[in-house]
Curated annotation (Swiss-Prot):
Keywords: ATP-binding, Cytoplasm, Kinase, Nucleotide-binding, Transferase. GO terms for molecular function: ATP binding; guanylate kinase activity. HAMAP family: Guanylate_kinase. It is found in: Cytoplasm. It catalyses: GMP + ATP = GDP + ADP. The keyword Lipid biosynthesis does not apply. The gene is gmk. Its EC number is 2.7.4.8. It comes from Jannaschia sp. (strain CCS1). One of its GO terms (cellular component) is cytosol. Its main location: cytoplasm. Residues 10-190 form the Guanylate kinase-like domain. This is Guanylate kinase.
Length: 218
């Protein structure tokens, strides 16, 4: 049996960071590096905005259906934000990882904690991206030219609450050089894919080795 025959389970890869730390750019680079990586499609009870497609940008659900999924344990994580519910349905993620595909999650520390405590928690890899400094974080937000000064100020105030949760993650990277951080992320993911728990065919392979060994001794 070759390494290519040892089909692996996929990983639930959680990327978290304060806004402006480079998480979205890194996620795009990871998906360009490995086309089997995909983002988890969240479910929400809010109305679709112009241009949004059901099943592509979000799964748009009635509130009763969303709550039913939560109460029956079919949501990996969920939250109530500005009057609407958001969450990650378990079924499509389970199907993806059993097929050997990794799923990316762009969620905060609370969502990460819920996923780690779920039935799929043992297949979770959590990574937090830190900025090199607070002034640099603010500079990056300002350089986007996407938000007003008030919005930037709100993002900056929220950033410390997110940064203070850094020690709840498996890996923490300081993104002072995007290319270096990208390579470190790839190294982490490559190694985590080889965890014993992620390779269910190993047991069969070892049994085959045992049989071959016993045949040699006969």
């Amino acid at each position: 049996m070759t390494m290519s025959d040892l089909r692996r389970r996929g990983l639930l890869i959680i990327l978290s960071s304060p806004s402006g730390a480079g998480k979205s750019t890194l996620a795009r680079r990871l998906m360009a590096w490995d086309e089997t990586l995909s983002f988890s499609v969240s479910a929400t009870t809010r109305q679709a905005r112009p241009g949004e497609e059901d099943g592509v940008h979000y799964r748009f659900l009635p509130e009763a259906e969303f709550k039913s999924l939560v109460s029956s344990g079919q949501m990996l994580e969920h939250a109530h934000v500005f009057g609407n519910f958001y969450g990650s349905p378990m079924a499509p993620v389970s199907q993806a990882i059993e097929a050997g595909h990794d799923v990316l999650f762009d969620i905060d520390w609370q969502g990460a904690q819920q996923i780690r405590n779920s039935d799929l928690g043992k297949h979770t890899l959590s990574i937090f991206i830190l900025p090199p400094s607070i002034p640099e974080l603010k500079r990056r937000l300002e350089s986007r030219a996407q938000d007003s000064d008030d919005v930037i100020e709100k993002r900056m105030r929220k950033s410390w609450d997110e940064i203070s949760r850094w020690d709840a993650y498996d890996y923490v990277l300081v993104n002072d050089d995007l290319s270096v951080t990208e390579e470190r992320l790839k190294t982490i993911i490559t190694a985590e894919r080889l965890r014993r728990e992620q390779q269910p065919a190993l047991q069969t392979h070892v049994r085959a080795l045992q049989t071959e060994f016993e045949d040699l001794e006969q």
